[in-house]
Amino acid sequence: MGSSSRVGDENSLLDLTEKVAVVTGANSGIGLYILFHVARAGAKVYLGARTEAKFNSAITRLKTEGLDTSKVVWLPFDLSDPRKAKESAKWLLERENRLDILINNAAKILGPYAQTSDGLSDSMVINHMSPYLFTKTLLPLLESTARQPGSDVRIVNVSSVAHRWVPNPRYDSLEAFNNNFADTWKPKTNLYGYTKLANVLWTKELQRSFDRANIPILAMTVHPGNVMSEGNVKLFTSLMFGTIINWVFSLFFISPFDGGYTPAFAAASRVIAEDRRKYAGAYIVPFGVIEEASEDARREDLAKDLLATTDAVLKQYDYA
């Protein structure tokens, strides 16, 4: 399917009028179009972006796509420090009495390994620890919404097929979290995949916790597809014969609009509403298909290690 394809019948999503949603990293790329699909269905949507300038730029682009942006609100959002992520969640808690949809989309993609000022892998902070704490802080609001009549609360964590490519993953220590994969063939890809595997493990454990407590919330992970995103365009252009490479990949990659559909499907599809248990903890690929996640992603021991270490690190650095 070429990058010019347009998928996603708006009638395939529930009517989200009177519903409240959050989409992080929604000022560009896939996130912009996740928000487009959800907002088009009628929801009030908080657009997570680091600056108001980025928010305003996104609004301009959404308007050119024909979206009524009157119910799109800026959520000041920065994943570079878990404290900032928690502040964003608390900011939202002060302003809303319900939250129906949370889509954790913001992420660091294939950048070089780096550490935060606290000496932590910035990829793990941005892609896992900050979204984890952001979500944890919002759980009371999500749970109270889920108990209201007629509610259909969903948490969608955007992962990647790269979660399948991690060699011998461990999450049992801070040292494991800080692995730079320098001794592997593709360190950047493996580092990214390591964080995306964490997304799947966390989501499945989150669903198990909801099920144990009989809380009617769905948690799902999504691979949005191989998307001709702005980041990929820049990456391909930077290579030798970049123009040709961009053209070739555009024949096989999908557009950001199409890439935004599968996360929106997970967040608001009528199909899921009709068979919620089928999708509980599911890993979903384009365009709304359940696929079995990797063997490592299904390991409960890895999930328990991940959450134990995450909570310990958040406590150690006084983030929580």
UniProtKB/Swiss-Prot annotation:
Stated family: Belongs to the short-chain dehydrogenases/reductases (SDR) family.
Gene3D superfamilies found in the cross-reference section: NAD(P)-binding Rossmann-like Domain (3.40.50.720)
InterPro entries hit by this protein: NAD(P)-bd_dom_sf, SDR_fam
Membrane topology, as annotated: Multi-pass membrane protein
Misc. remarks from the entry: Armillaria species are both devastating forest pathogens and some of the largest and oldest terrestrial organisms on Earth. They forage for hosts and achieve immense colony sizes via rhizomorphs, root-like multicellular structures of clonal dispersal. One genetic Armillaria gallica individual localized in Michigan's Upper Peninsula stands out as exceptionally large, covering hundreds of tree root systems over approximately 75 hectares of the forest floor. Based on observed growth rates of the fungus, the minimum age of this large individual can be estimated as 2500 years.
Entry function: Short-chain dehydrogenase/reductase, part of the gene cluster that mediates the biosynthesis of melleolides, a range of antifungal and phytotoxic polyketide derivatives composed of an orsellinic acid (OA) moiety esterified to various sesquiterpene alcohols. The first step in melleolides biosynthesis is performed by the delta(6)-protoilludene synthase PRO1 which catalyzes the cyclization of farnesyl diphosphate to protoilludene.
Glycosylated residue positions: N157
Pathway(s) the chain acts in: Secondary metabolite biosynthesis
Active site (catalytic residues): S159 (proton donor), Y192 (proton acceptor), K196 (lowers pka of active site tyr)
Residue sites binding NADP(+) per the record: I30, D78, N105, K136, Y192, K196, V227, S229
Keyword tags: Glycoprotein, Membrane, NADP, Oxidoreductase, Transmembrane, Transmembrane helix
Provenance organism: Armillaria gallica (Bulbous honey fungus)
Residue spans crossing the bilayer: 19-39, 235-255
Biotechnology: Melleolide sesquiterpene aryl esters are cytotoxic secondary products with anti-cancer potential. Armillaridin shows therapeutic and radiosensitizing effects on human esophageal cancer cells. Armillaridin induces autophagy-associated cell death in human chronic myelogenous leukemia as well as of hepatocellular carcinoma cells. Armillaridin can also inhibit the differentiation and activation of human macrophages and thus might have potential to be developed as a biological response modifier for inflammatory diseases.
One GO cellular component term: membrane
Origin superkingdom: Eukaryota
Record-given protein name: Short-chain dehydrogenase/reductase ARMGADRAFT_1169971
GO molecular function list: oxidoreductase activity
A Pfam family the protein falls into: adh_short
Enzyme Commission numbers on file: 1.1.1.-
Subcellular locations according to the entry: Membrane
